[in-house]
Amino acid sequence: MKKKSLFLFVLLFVFINIVAQKKEICIIKTSLGDITVELYAKKAPITVANFLKYVDAHLYDNTSFFRSVTLNNQPKDSVKIEVIQGGEIDSTKVFTAIPLERTTKTGILHKNGTLSMARDKPDSATCSFFICINDQPSLDYKGKRNKDGQGFAAFGKVTKGMNVAKIIQQLHPEQGQYFKPEVTILSISRKQ
């Protein structure tokens, strides 16, 4: 009886660890192709939970990538970045802003393909997110892109479809950062 109980306990322990280590994967389906992202729930639990609230409520469906920041379309900025930004939602459907999970806490830096939350001031991120094109250390804590030096909340990484993100970034260089037509985000869903 003791051996059976011990065996069941060990089996349960192994199962719990496997479930706890399950990767959270989402697929961003766009009109130009899919972008697959892995979310780092253990490192950035607040930001991932926030993103998944929008995903699970289907609020990102039929939104868009609306902004592309390239080295050539930010002439007034002394610190240049390269990102694409999307996921802007009707203000009546936006959830409460979340606390900023700084890169010093999470250890997730703004490298090529990093998924991060857009914000104005600290603790103001809601739904809009961006994907880094190339490494962007100026978006990390103490980075110079934002005057407050607090950085942005990185919470995942593109694992497939980075070519789609780069196509979006280069679509309309003549239009500046905000472009038309926007690239439709058909849906964002969890990978089953």
Predicted regions and their residues:
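Bacterial Sec-dependent N-terminal signal peptides
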Residues: 1-23
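Cyclophilin-like peptidyl-prolyl cis-trans isomerases
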Residues: 18-192
